[in-house]
Design a protein with these regions (language model features):
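Glycine-rich, small-residue loops and helix-cap segments
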Residues: 15, 26, 67, 73, ...
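Immediate post-signal peptide segment of exported/extracytoplasmic ligand-binding proteins
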Residues: 52-69, 234-241
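Structural helix-boundary/capping segments
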Residues: 160, 164-248, 262, 267, ...
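Short glycine/serine-rich loop/turn segments
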Residues: 65-206, 360-379
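An N-terminal boundary/leader segment
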Residues: 1-47, 57, 266, 441-442
Length: 442
């Protein structure tokens, strides 16, 4: 896992390292890691690093993080680069003329983008596979496993220590699932938290952004940087957690995941109140998705309809194509009903949680082996649905959430716990994730 941002900032301030060294090391590691990046911005990153070193030499850094390398999922516009969305259908896309606002905000603090990371095509899969640019894999024991998606490259770039932080997008779990599968921290924001301009969309009513890093504090630092605000010290007050036993008792939650989650609760219950209750809004949202379909699939199909019906259709990953084609069954009337249900259940959720934080496993299972799923499209589709089952509901309810690595299985598969709250309560859920992270380490 990477060094954290505060340690790197201290090293820069003390002269123990400099931006050129940091960027050169990041680029070297990136070149040695297959399929993590779609575009490496070597010349631009090194030029930025030399400029940052000159600022440090003059005693005028842009911030304490001036010169630290980061990475961006290849959905974000970065001036002079093509935004691929992980698809060969965009091989001829015109390079971006300017940075997306969130990219520009981090540049103003001196963060250096070294490249654009791999992802599931169009960001439309929870497993992270990409037949066009390869599938990145985390540095874990045993045979390669799915990295989680769709922000697969961003998670692996952090897990392999290429960069201390990378930015992803999340529509149904695309930050939190790869964080869970690779053992990183992943923060998915409420939808309205960031400026979404210059970010290639999947489903406009559900798309959100978020950083992946080695600790919650680094996610909070990147969150502030992306918004152009000063990072605030997160108060470490014990949270009140809500546990819905009917979520945990689902037979699809595997035994290792369930046992680990109960262990997490046992370790924190002496220090934080845990309220066990059925969260009706959660189950009503799940029922709506099951009955009417996934709103994100409906919106994604309409976004990509020209590709689906045009000459570039054959260039699309067959597994992504199958999901987009399947969304044709969702009618406009069903989509409108989903929008109405969503608004209603978001209000219900806020009342039910009453300022508390829902805590649950991030995913019902650990990272699956890569090879069997690559060889079996039907099984791939089945596992993809199961992988997104929990995070998708939280996304439907616009819940900000943190996927926190809280342990591992005996054979080294990461285990993750998800903290999520009512829409707009991002600062609180980040603070509570810091509290939980520190409590479990003590």
């Amino acid at each position: 896992m990477p060094e954290n941002l505060d340690d790197l900032a201290a090293d820069l301030a003390a002269g123990r390292t400099d931006p050129v060294q940091l960027v050169e090391r990041a680029l070297e590691r990136a070149r040695a890691s297959d399929a993590v990046f779609i575009t490496l911005m070597e010349d631009a990153a090194l030029a930025d690093a030399h400029a940052a070193r000159r600022r440090w030499t003059r005693g005028q850094p842009l911030s304490s993080h001036d010169g630290i390398p980061i990475a961006w999922k290849d959905l974000f516009d970065i001036a002079g680069t093509r935004t691929s969305a992980g698809s060969r259908t965009r091989d001829e896309a015109v390079p971006a003329g300017c940075d997306a606002p969130v990219v520009a905000a981090t540049r103003r603090l001196g963060f250096i983008p070294i490249g654009k990371t791999n992802l599931s095509e169009f960001a439309f899969s929870g497993l992270g596979a990409n037949p066009h640019f390869g599938t990145p894999t985390a540095d874990l024991p045993g045979a390669p496993r799915m990295p989680g998606g769709s922000s697969s490259g961003s998670a692996v770039a952090v897990q392999r220590g290429i960069v201390p932080a990378a930015i992803g997008t999340d529509t149904a779990g695309s930050v939190r699932v790869p964080a869970a599968f690779t053992g990183c921290v992943g923060y998915k924001a409420s939808q309205a938290r960031y400026d979404m301009a210059g970010v290639f969309p999947l489903a406009g009513s559900l798309d959100s952004l978020g950083p992946l890093a080695g600790c919650v504090a680094d996610c909070a630092t990147m969150d502030a940087a992306m918004r152009g605000v000063s990072a605030q010290l997160l108060p470490l007050t014990p949270p009140q957690f809500v546990v819905d036993d009917s979520i945990i008792d689902d037979p699809a939650v595997t035994a290792p995941v369930r046992a680990h989650f109960e262990d997490v609760l046992a370790r924190v219950s002496p220090y934080a109140p845990i309220r066990r209750q059925r969260v009706d809004a959660w189950h009503r949202a799940r029922e709506a998705i099951t009955t009417l379909g996934w709103l994100g699939a409906y919106e994604a199909r309409h976004l990509h309809i020209d590709t689906l019906t045009g000459p570039k259709r054959s260039l699309v990953d067959a597994r992504v194509l199958s999901r987009l084609d399947g969304a044709a069954r969702i009618s406009a009337e069903a989509a409108a009903e989903l929008v109405a249900i969503r608004a209603r259940e978001m209000q219900r959720l806020r009342a039910e949680l009453a300022g508390a934080t829902l805590i649950l496993p991030t995913v019902k299972h650990t990272a699956p082996l890569l090879a069997p799923l690559e060889a079996d499209p039907a099984r791939f589709a089945e596992v993809n649905v199961a992988t997104l089952a929990l995070t998708m509901i939280a996304s439907f309810l616009d819940m900000p959430g943190v996927a926190l690595p809280t342990g591992s299985t005996a054979d080294g598969r990461p285990l993750s716990t998800h903290l999520c709250a009512a829409s707009g309560e991002d600062d609180r859920v980040l603070a509570q994730a810091v509290w939980l992270e520190q409590r479990l380490r003590s």
